[in-house]
């Protein structure tokens, strides 16, 4: 259990993308580079420990509070992987049953590999809160999402400094690129879960390509780098065939 650092929620305007989206595995290597060292493959079990804190759904992953869904967790600092696990899901096997939670935060006070800090309500679904610290095992799984992925343009963004966050993704997102002068440009992901282009992505429409952990890619075109806007994409990553 720990003291949570909250990031204030923001009102978002949602704009539907009127166009182009493509989904598929990259066959020519152009969508490669999706491997992140230390990231568990989907379905691979990890022995671990669960604790709980006063989670709101917000945190270091820079998501808004989600009072309607608090099946959320903070990842131990070693497996947070500079926010690469943000928005991904894990299934936990606890004494009282199984539960799928979404990673929304990091836990700097959780030094051990496998440690997950859950919301109070999530913890109570699979273990007795009186126990406080419970040994479990868990595995990364696909998130049970509906609809397409979405893209949040961070407040303060413009054509000269652009930060994009991918939301509502079924699989872990490992890479984001944008199209510049006919070529895809890899964008660095920051620890607060935004892909940031410090020189900006330019004026007008922005072509985006995101890559999932398994190599699938999605392409969308955003109307522009409008500060604090949420744009709906055109498609979603396919669920893995193994049922994870």
Residues of each region from the PLM?
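Residue-level signal for mature regions of secreted extracellular proteins and peptides
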Residues: 16-17, 54
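Bacterial N-terminal signal peptides that target proteins for export
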Residues: 1-12
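Secreted/periplasmic proteins
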Residues: 24-214, 219-244
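C-terminal motif of bacterial Sec signal peptides marking the signal peptidase cleavage site
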Residues: 19-22
């Amino acid at each position: 259990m720990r003291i949570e650092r909250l990031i204030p929620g923001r009102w978002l305007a949602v704009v539907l993308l009127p166009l182009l989206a493509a989904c598929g595995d990259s066959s020519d290597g152009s969508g490669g580079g999706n491997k992140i060292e230390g990231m568990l493959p989907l379905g691979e079990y990890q022995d671990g420990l669960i604790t709980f804190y006063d989670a709101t759904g917000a945190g270091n992953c820079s998501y808004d509070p989600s009072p309607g869904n608090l099946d959320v967790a903070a990842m131990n600092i070693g497996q947070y992987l500079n926010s690469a696990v943000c928005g991904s899901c894990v299934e936990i096997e606890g004494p009282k049953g199984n539960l799928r939670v979404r990673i929304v935060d990091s836990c700097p006070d959780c030094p051990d590999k496998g440690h997950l800090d859950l919301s109070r309500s999530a913890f109570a679904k699979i273990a007795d809160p009186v126990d406080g610290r419970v040994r479990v095992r868990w595995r990364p799984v696909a998130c049970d999402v509906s609809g397409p992925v979405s893209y949040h343009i961070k407040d303060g963004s413009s054509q000269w400094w652009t930060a994009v966050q991918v939301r509502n993704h079924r699989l872990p997102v490992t890479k984001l690129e944008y199209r510049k002068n006919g070529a895809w440009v890899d964008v660095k992901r920051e620890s607060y879960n935004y892909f940031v282009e410090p020189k900006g992505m330019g004026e007008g429409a922005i072509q985006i390509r995101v890559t999932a952990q398994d190599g699938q890619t999605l392409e969308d075109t955003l109307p522009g780098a409008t500060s604090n806007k949420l744009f709906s994409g055109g498609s979603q990553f396919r669920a893995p065939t193994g049922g994870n």
